[in-house]
A protein has these predicted regions:
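N-terminal intrinsically disordered, cationic/polar leader segments
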Residues: 1-151
Length: 151
């Protein structure tokens, strides 16, 4: 009957959402493992940015240079975003495993995924991580669209 059909639809939607969570997790792990996040790669990018500052010919005082370098290093660190994405994936899986009306909670989670993927893109100063961030945003959009179909 109608209840059986709704249960089947619900199971199919759950499987689809779990697939999106798997994709979000895989992209998060790719960003985490990206070679651009190695300290040597970050140092090289910082050195290049500092060189550009110095080449601009403007007088640069030592304190300002240290401040800029610290700022650039902090901006490049996406550890928190990666940790939060992993936590949100685990939360999504728990919600889907629990069953029941989880639409509103998953909608909130999709907003969190969106926020973290946006931050990942804006913080990234490596093309490879930005590309992963953009892929992540696409999967998050698909996840959010499917969540809209939930009760």
């Amino acid at each position: 009957g109608l209840d059986a059909a709704r249960r089947e639809d619900g199971a199919a939607l759950r499987d689809l959402l779990l697939g999106h969570l798997d994709a979000i997790e895989a992209l998060t792990l790719r960003a985490e493992a990206d070679p651009s996040r190695e300290p040597a790669a970050i140092r090289a990018r910082l050195a290049e940015q500092v060189r550009l500052l110095l080449d601009a010919g403007a007088p640069v005082d030592e304190a300002r240079l240290h401040m800029e370098a610290a700022f650039l290093a902090a901006k490049a660190d996406i550890r928190e975003e990666i940790d939060r994405l992993k936590t949100h994936v685990a939360s999504g899986r728990s919600l889907l495993a629990a069953g029941g009306p989880v639409g509103r909670k998953l909608d909130f989670l999709s907003q969190e995924f969106n926020r973290e993927s946006n931050t990942l893109c804006s913080k990234s100063n490596a093309a490879s991580v930005t590309a992963i961030g953009l892929e992540l945003k696409a999967v998050v959009d698909q996840f959010r669209e499917q969540v809209q179909n939930l009760e």
